[in-house]
């Protein structure tokens, strides 16, 4: 009996889902609507990630803390995000997408409750930490679930990427509008977000993903690798053959997301000074414009080669940072608005290029960990930027510090574009 249950049938399934082995039995891919539905949990969790942004002024007034403490609260989010990326990708590839996504959404709902009732800075930092953990799971398991259900269709990386940037843009404007128009702003904003996360839980429950662990048969038939065994908590990585693909993805994505962090950290205060208003919905609208730009660019660039997409990212990121530095020194509105649109385009193109390259080249049973590696590299740079900028601003003044950081991000983007141009054959 035992011998009849263990024939070497799984061997043909060792190839990535995007490139099935010849002769392997293939099931029909899920309907396209399932790919769209799978994007919603990613959108919902990224709405949470930025929903707090317009409300920091409310908390500062209620809890009485300064800019230095605010920097530490932001850092709690980055710590949670990076910590989740150390384990979420591996766990998702070994256990499946749902066992990672469901706890992430539940953590997001808990974070909403803490935000809504935060009695202290410590509680606020705890909510940001939980938000970071939930977001880290979203970029690992959530985005991998979208590409899994796409079954090799180009729609998968596109929707996974646009879901992230669209959610990140909706969060600030939703929170800004509700906080200006509804009573009890923090309770209202995070009550609505908790409902959105509950609907995302329902979507995850009905996702037509396999019950078994993704890639389990592939790992059983293939020789042991660093991705199929070893520690559950580790720096996310990709197979040796895909390291060059990860490097090219990071060359566009890391400077791009750093530029959006740079613009978001300075843009609202500059806009407030230029227009003479502190309306929270206006700051949220600025963030939405940035991420709508990212979404639009991703749909516009869904057909060109990945190399072209990454080069567009580099050019847009360099232009965005130089435009913001110009706005800081001239006090002009036009370069500030240009920096918003260009930064969104830089992140959107870099993220789409990186995700497309990894989903195409990395085996399916390492896909979530590959997504985690891409995002860990990008968020590590983008997360460190506002913290370092805050301390350098105290020492040198805001204009000098912002100029130095803007030029540094521009230099990184230019170097990344040069790498892509030189290694174009690896980014088809």
Describe these PLM feature segments.
Residues 64, 96, 117-122, 183, ...:
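Helix-breaking motifs and short loop linkers at transmembrane-helix boundaries and internal kinks
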Residues 82-121:
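Conserved MFS/SLC helix-loop-helix module at the cytosolic interface between two early adjacent transmembrane helices
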Residues 127-164:
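Cytoplasmic helix-loop-helix junction between adjacent transmembrane helices
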Residues 152-153, 158-208:
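Helix-loop-helix hairpin linking two adjacent transmembrane segments in secondary transporters
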Residues 187-204, 402-420:
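Symmetry-related core transmembrane helices of the 12-TM Major Facilitator Superfamily/SLC fold
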Residues 282-306, 320:
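Transmembrane alpha-helices of Major Facilitator/SLC transporters
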Residues 308-352:
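C-terminal transmembrane helical hairpin of 12-TM major facilitator-type secondary transporters
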Residues 347, 355-406:
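A late C-terminal transmembrane helix in Major Facilitator Superfamily
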């Amino acid at each position: 009996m035992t011998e009849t249950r263990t024939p070497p049938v799984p061997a043909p399934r060792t190839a990535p889902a995007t490139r099935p082995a010849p002769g392997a039995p293939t099931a029909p891919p899920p309907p396209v609507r399932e790919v769209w539905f799978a994007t919603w949990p990613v959108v919902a969790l990224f709405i949470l990630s930025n929903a707090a942004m317009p409300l920091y002024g409310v908390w500062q007034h209620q809890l009485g803390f300064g800019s230095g403490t605010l920097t530490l609260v932001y850092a709690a989010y980055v710590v949670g995000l990076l910590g989740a990326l150390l384990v979420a990708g591996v766990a998702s590839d070994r256990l499946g997408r749902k066992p990672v996504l469901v706890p992430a959404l539940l953590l997001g709902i808990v974070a909403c409750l803490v935000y809504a009732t935060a009695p202290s800075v410590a509680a606020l930092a705890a909510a940001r930490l939980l938000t970071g953990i939930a977001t880290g799971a979203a970029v690992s398991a959530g985005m991998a679930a979208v590409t899994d259900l796409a079954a090799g269709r180009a729609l998968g990386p596109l929707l996974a990427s646009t879901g992230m940037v669209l959610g990140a843009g909706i969060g600030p404007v939703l929170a800004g509008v509700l906080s200006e128009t509804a009573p009890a702003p923090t309770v209202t904003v995070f009550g609505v977000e908790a409902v959105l996360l509950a609907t995302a839980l329902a979507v995850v429950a009905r996702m037509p993903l396999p019950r078994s662990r993704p890639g389990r048969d592939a790992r059983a038939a293939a020789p042991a690798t660093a991705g199929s065994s070893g520690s559950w908590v580790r720096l996310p990585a990709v197979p040796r053959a895909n390291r060059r693909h990860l490097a090219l993805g990071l060359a566009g994505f890391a400077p791009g997301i750093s530029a959006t962090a740079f613009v978001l950290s300075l843009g609202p205060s500059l806009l407030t000074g230029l227009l003479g208003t502190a309306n929270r919905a206006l700051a949220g609208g600025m963030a939405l414009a940035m991420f709508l730009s990212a979404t639009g660019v991703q749909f516009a660039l869904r057909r060109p080669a990945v190399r072209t997409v990454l080069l567009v990212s580099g050019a847009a990121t360099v232009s965005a940072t130089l435009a913001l530095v110009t706005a800081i020194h001239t006090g002009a509105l036009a370069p500030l608005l240009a920096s918003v649109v260009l930064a969104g385009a830089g992140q959107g193109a870099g993220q789409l290029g990186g995700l497309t390259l990894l989903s195409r080249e990395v085996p399916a049973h390492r896909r979530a960990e590959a997504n985690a590696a891409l995002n860990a590299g990008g968020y590590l740079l983008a997360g460190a930027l506002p913290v370092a900028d805050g301390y350098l601003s105290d020492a040198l003044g805001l204009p000098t510090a912002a100029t130095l950081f803007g030029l540094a991000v521009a230099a990184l983007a230019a170097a990344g574009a040069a790498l892509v141009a030189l290694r174009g054959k690896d980014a088809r």
